[in-house]
Each structure stands twice: as C-alpha cells, then as structure tokens.
Amino acid sequence: MTVRDWANRGQTYVNARAPNLLGRFRSTDDEDENNPSTELATDTTSAYGSTAASVVTMANSKPDDVSLYATSSHHHEYFTGSAWIHPVYTKEQMDALEVNHRKTETFSDRVALRAILLMRIIFDLCTGYKHPKEGEAHLPKFRMTTRQWLDRFLFLESIAGVPGMVAGMIRHLHSLRALRRDRAWIESLVEEAYNERMHLLTFLKLQKPSVQMRTGLLIGQIIFYNLFFISYLISPATCHRFVGYLEEEAVITYTRCLEDIDAGRLPELASMEVPDIARTYWHMEDDCTMRDLIQYVRADEAKHCEVNHTFGNLHQTSDRNPFALVIDNGRPQPSKDLTTFRSVGWRRDEIAN
C-alpha cells in the first residue's frame, strides 16, 4: 500500500475530527494572514491534499499564552488541573498564623542555621533587600518597590522548589534499591516542590524577569541543586532542618510584604489582578486581592516550615510521614491543613504510630 493510499484511508477520519481538534489548539492569531502557521497550511500542496494541510496547521498552531511570563487573562480550554489538590485555608487561620523561630538544639541544627544565614546574605544582596528593625520599615533605605518585591519572590521560589524534588528523588531511588516502601515521605516532598513551583508560576504571570535575573537563577539553581544533593546523601535530617529555617525566612519575606501593603507603600502591587492560575489552585474567591494571594503563599511557606522541622526530628528511614495519615489517639496530630499548625515542628514522641 502506497503512502497516498494510507493518506486517503485516514482522510475521512481527519476531516471528521480536525474541526474539533483545531478548535481546541488553534490560536486566534492563526486566522491572521501574517501568521506563519496559516501561511504554511494554505501554501502546502502535496499528494495528501487537505489531510496534509490540516496536520500542518495543527503542528504549527500555538495557544494564546505561549509564554510563562505572559500577562494575558484569557481562559484556555487546555488548562489542566493541579496534580495535588491544595488544602483549604480559612481567612481566620491565615490571619492568626504565627511562625516562631525554632531554637537550635544539636550541632547539625547549628550547621543548618549558619548555612541559612550565609544564604540569606547572598539572597538579600541579589534582590536589594534590607531588613528593617522594629519601626524602621517606613524609612527610604528600607523601601522596596513592586518590581523589587516580585524579583525577590521569583528568586526565592526558584530556589525553594529544589529541596523537595531532590529529597523526593533520592528517597525514591533508595526505595527502589531497598525494595521497600518509603512510608509516604516521597509524596509530601514532591508535593512541596510542586507547590513552590506553583508559587513561581503565579508570580511569573505578574512580572517577567530580566536577563540578569534569569542568569542569576540559572547559576543559583546549578550550585544549590548539587550542594543540596550531596548534603542530603550525607545527612538528610540536617537538610530538612535547613529547609525548615529557609521557610522561616520565606515567611518573614511575605510578612514584610503584607506589612508594606497594609501601610499603603505598595499601591501598584496591591492593585494588581490575581492571576487565574492562583485563583484555581488556591480555590480563591472571585473578589480576591493581591493581599489575599500573598497570605496564601505565606501560609504555604509556614506549612513547609512545620513539615520540614518535623521531618528533621524523625528517624529518616523507619518513621512514617505523619502528615500523610492522621491517626486519632486522643491528642492533636499533624495535618495537611492549618488546623493543628505548629511552626517549630512536632517532636517524635508526640506523633502517634
């Protein structure tokens, strides 16, 4: 059977399906005479006739929003749901959220905290941030513009999404080698990385990073990924403590931003429209504001703080993940939402087994 015969046999199916398929994938720009995909489709002549034209049009068409950094508010049929359903946070829970610094108790705790303090210095230099003392936030030298805040968020989230994926990957490979289950650690770690990436994708809808920023993110990710990978092989408990302290710093960042919004120092940021990706992921109300969005992100970071400080207290190979399954023993237990939130983490003897 020749190629032409195969094309003719499939032409009936393609003609019946193409209008529906093209309607889902074709952009409004495809109708423009200057659009390459339209020109390619109309100028193509071959033995395949309309079949070839249809396939070429589909292959070269593009959705409205082809860039991660686009600010278009268009809705798309091809938008996929979240791999993990985000827990619902109430406004009362987020308003009452307090994150306390966990004091160091062991040598590994001190190593983790000092590593974070060093990383914080580099992070502040890269984003032009200076942390004010009590009552000094209004001074000009501590002022942060909307662009500076969004740059800081982008930098933070691009780094914060690394530990969960690295830890999850290492534990996944260990589970394969050991031929046994991981007691549900992998799921929470990968979900954490996914959550941080959703933060990043949300802020990318609000601001496109500069070339310098993207270069810095690339270099930072390469260095941080490899250092964290090696460190997790050596001492996973120390790495979880490190992430716990990292999330404490993230909470401080978003808390400071909320204070600036409330004080009227960020009118441009406060007036921005919440991206659709955020509305869907966090189940936000129709009248939500940027302040609400920052509160949701802050609550996520606080939750990661609790999870990783708890993981740092547990036996790394034999203890179960207490956030994956809640066992009722008559005492408060860790949960996926904020109902039993404890920022400094849960001690091993507090968790039901």
UniProtKB/Swiss-Prot annotation:
Q: Which domain of life is it from?
A: Eukaryota
Tell me the Pfam families matching this sequence: AOX
Query: Cofactor comment in the record?
Result: Binds 2 iron ions per subunit.
Q: What is its main location?
A: mitochondrion
Question: What cofactor does this protein call for?
Answer: Fe cation
MF terms from GO for this chain are: alternative oxidase activity; metal ion binding
Entry-linked InterPro entries: AOX (IPR002680), AOX_sf (IPR038659)
Question: In which organism is this protein found?
Answer: Yarrowia lipolytica (strain CLIB 122 / E 150)
Alphabetically ordered keywords of this record: Electron transport, Iron, Membrane, Metal-binding, Mitochondrion, Mitochondrion inner membrane, Oxidoreductase, Respiratory chain, Transit peptide, Transmembrane, Transmembrane helix, Transport
The membrane topology of this protein is: Multi-pass membrane protein
Q: Where is the composition biased (Polar residues)?
A: 35-45
**Protein's recorded name:** Alternative oxidase, mitochondrial
